[in-house]
Design a protein with these regions (language model features):
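Alpha-helix termination/capping residues and helix-transition junctions
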Residues: 14, 165-167, 230
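Flexible, low-complexity junctional segments that flank or bridge functional domains
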Residues: 4, 20-221, 277, 285, ...
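Sec-dependent bacterial lipoprotein signal peptides
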Residues: 1-18
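C-terminal "post-core" interaction segments
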Residues: 21-35, 40-41, 179-343
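Low-complexity, intrinsically disordered regions enriched in charged/polar residues
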Residues: 7-11, 49-52, 56, 69, ...
Length: 343
């Protein structure tokens, strides 16, 4: 059955809520709050089979660090360290003074410098429509930077952007340092680059407390934008780095399936789980990956989406000091190759 991402999202949330069994009550003390955290993650986290962790042993290891009179800060640190064992940027503990996080991209080259792009490639001559910065570079390749999928983009905005870029020989979509946001904006953008219905991926939700209790995958599809709107069907390169996370990871995985698209840069930061939030007895909020999103081929992209073959590039400090963006330069080469193959 054909399902849009919006319908799937609502369906998964509804099914997740209906699948939750009666919750155990926990005391509002260090042990009760810890047990509430461990139990909810144990029953609802969706990536145990990929993370190669013994959650039972991890729980015992960190519970042994508790003390009846420990401070809230000490408890927060113990719980945060336990969650980091999952290696999941979508899994966070949120208190009134801090948010735990696992940001693996901090260990890798940054691979993006906004100033270099603005000064040496756009020459500070660009347009801005809603959350999209765009322009045509000196080599007649179009460039658009979308730095946040939470940023609103209307259909009119996309018409204006793509109409301006229509004369370009190819298009670069830069989503480096885009930490994610609204999946519906992913769909809105992808629809401008397809001419027929696209199988974008599938979503599975938890059906019970067991680590392998999952529904059958729900396939979701994107429809091309109607012919009254503007599409871009020339060669496209998407630029990504390790900070391309969550909804951006999803966008890159979908665009990579299109025949006229290449991915250049570094592996994305992953984050393919659909988050769910719950509260501990003391009021702290917990966010975790609770529904599994796969790509159209059934592959889990929780650990990131690799660049297209031959398109892995890192930026060096020496190049950046000279105002060179090696990832953008490689994108030019790829677009030239793709353009020559079309002739």
């Amino acid at each position: 059955m054909k399902k849009s991402l919006y319908i799937i999202y609502i369906l998964v949330i509804s099914l997740f809520a209906s699948s939750c069994h009666e919750q155990e009550e926990f005391a509002n003390d260090p042990y009760g709050n810890f047990d509430a955290l461990w139990t909810n993650v144990d029953q609802h986290y969706c990536f145990f089979k990929y993370k190669n962790v013994d959650w039972e042993a991890i729980g015992q290891q960190y519970r042994a660090k508790l003390r009846p009179k420990m401070s809230s800060t000490e408890l927060f640190d113990v719980c945060s360290d336990m969650l980091k064992e999952l290696r999941d940027g979508h899994t966070n503990l949120m208190s009134g003074w801090d948010v735990s996080r696992y940001w693996i991209w901090e260990q890798y080259p940054k691979n993006y410098d906004e100033r270099i792009v603005n000064e040496y490639y756009l020459h500070f001559d660009y347009r801005q429509s809603a959350s999209i910065k765009y322009g045509i570079l000196s080599n007649n390749f179009g460039y658009m930077y979308y730095g946040d999928f939470m940023g609103a983009i209307g259909e009119g905005n996309l018409d204006n952007v793509l109409a301006y870029l229509a004369s370009s020989e190819g298009l670069i979509i830069d989503v480096r340092d885009n930490g994610g946001g609204n999946l519906l904006n992913v769909e809105k953008l992808v629809r401008r680059f397809i001419t027929e219905r696209l199988h974008a991926g599938a979503i599975s939700h938890k059906t019970g407390p067991g680590h392998n209790d999952f529904s059958q995958p729900f396939d979701y599809y994107f429809e091309p934008i109607d012919d009254t709107r503007i599409k871009y069907l020339k060669p496209v390169v998407v630029l990504a780095n390790r900070s391309s996370f969550s909804a951006t990871n999803n966008f890159v995985s979908i665009m990579k399936t299109l025949p006229n698209v290449r991915i250049v840069g570094d592996t994305t930061g992953g984050g393919s789980g659909l988050p769910f939030t719950f509260d501990l007895p003391n009021g702290w909020a917990v966010r975790m990956s609770a529904s599994e999103i796969t790509d159209a081929n059934g592959n889990v992209t929780e650990f990131g989406v690799d660049p297209s073959p031959g398109c892995k590039v890192d930026m060096t400090e020496a190049e950046m000091a000279m105002g060179k963006d090696a990832i953008l330069e490689r994108a030019f080469e790829v677009l030239e190759e793709m353009a020559s193959n079309r002739k």
